[in-house]
Amino acid sequence: MFVEALKRQNPALISAALSLWQQGKIAPDSWVIDVDQILENGKRQIETARLYGIELYLMTKQFGRNPWLAEKLLALGYSGIVAVDYKEARVMRRAGLPVAHQGHLVQIPCHQVADAVEQGTDVITVFTLDKAREVSAAAVKAGRIQSVLLKVYSDDDFLYPGQESGFVQHSLHEVVAEIKKLPGLHLAGLTHFPCLLWDEAAGKVLPTPNLHTLIQARDQLAKSGIAIEQLNAPSATSCTSLPLLAQYGVTHAEPGHALTGTIPANQQGDQPERIAMLWLSEISHHFRGDSYCYGGGYYRRGHAQHALVFSPENQKITETNLKTVDDSSIDYYLPLAGEFPVSSAVVFCFRTQIFVTRSDVVLVSGIQRGEPEIVGRYDSLGNSLEA
């Protein structure tokens, strides 16, 4: 999906990854991250967000819940980390990093609620009154006032399969009335997902019905004299979409893919955020005229289509196509069109969620100045690996 953008925006990353692979320093099934570029992307986002008065929570799941990288990004001015689930929150808290938002997309399990409250999570999203009561009880026990966000939806909204959740908008007044009765809770705001999506036909990011539902819910509360301080609208957050969010009065957003430049808007390599990671593999064998490279990092929603194959013998890079991958299979290997020498390196660049892969994550600094140096190795869940 992003091979052309990678070649255009960050050819130095390709060269660095291949050089480190040739030295035996990077194994197949590794996501190689250009640390300096991802920090530059983050800096640009923070600067843009400040121009429009929007706070940013840092989303880390796309780059493997990596605490080392998260700490560097937080130093740029992000308002904390949004933990997409309780396991990500655990990784970040163990690293001593601030989790600012928890409960969205995945609710906090009952026996983890108290810890989230006691650790000082800025806002906790709830989908049900039952979960709100659990948060209330934990807040009372901890002697704290816990801010919460309500996830809302309407019947015509777009919800990803497996993510169906929230309070239906027409019940919002009744829900808020119940929330107000719960001690230890402060209704801070509303959220929904996805609020923006890339439209291939239009060639740009557009608001979803979900964003309109979110705005209507805010206005509904305002008419009843209920003011909220946070209107959280995640999905497709980037330098080019932040002005659009500002037009709708959004106060908080949660960039993830834009940090690595792997947003659909960047397929041509023309966005402010530049490609900052690639996936490295290696040809294992041939079968019936095609080549098979080591798998482990394939993401079925990633729109992977093309790959660059590097032969050490002639130092030649050839572009080829990824053949159809059967969705019922385990990605032990990925099939590439044509025969290439065994043990050639393979470079992919596609939209991923590293935390659901088996990949290693290799952090490399100094790429843009021609002095690549590996500064960290982690697994896909943010655990440090031996050098």
Task: List each model region and its residues.
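C-terminal accessory subdomain/extension
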Residues: 290-387
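Conserved active-site and cofactor/substrate-binding residues in soluble primary-metabolism enzymes
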Residues: 33-40, 64, 68, 87, ...
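Active-site loop ensemble at the mouth of alpha/beta enzyme cores that anchors a bound cofactor
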Residues: 237-317
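Active-site-proximal beta-alpha core segment in soluble small-molecule metabolic enzymes
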Residues: 57-188, 192-198
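Active-site loop/helix belt of alpha/beta enzymes
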Residues: 154-268
